[in-house]
Amino acid sequence: MKLNVVNLPSTDSPLRKSPGFAKKRLSDYALDILGLCEYGCRYCSSNAGNFLRIRREQFADATEEQLGKRLYPSSDPTLTFHWPNVLAKLEAMLDGKRVDWGEGRTVVFSMLTDGFSPSLVADGTTRRALELVIARTGLRIRVLTKNACVGSNDWIEFFKRYPDRFVVGLSIGTLDDAWSKRVEINTSPPSQRVK
């Protein structure tokens, strides 16, 4: 399925405190590297939730300007919002912090969207963001994704280099590949995620 990619100005703070997850003791911080992931899940709160609803018309204006038509996340599963300068923003946020900053704390990667969206994995954005956090902080990284690529030899070797820094999970809403294709439009099939 061809994606409709819209580039938006990056958030000024891709790495931020995560009070909701902190209460649940899941993470202290959240790192989101794109505005809307590529999976088009019908049930996703990022597709129809407050984060995008507040800016609904701004996003529709951007789709019209860049794609020639008004599109909304809740009605178009091919729509994704990228932040082209997110790595520069992350680097700027980490400048001046001590290398041990965040030791004993956890960052969830990503909270609102999936940082392992296929195009970000392919162009190296995902790996570079994780490398920045590893090199410039003491944070543990909690990955939750629907992309089966985290089980590939390449990614397993990457995670193994930092065994005390990563907790990696695959989200599975169903074991039925056909149902998943209707509801989690562009994700890795569940049968690939459970291998």
Regions found by a protein language model. Name each.
Residues K2-V167, L175-A178, P190-R193:
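Conserved Radical SAM active-site core
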Residues R182-S188:
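Short glycine-enriched, charge-decorated loop/helix-capping segments at active-site entrances
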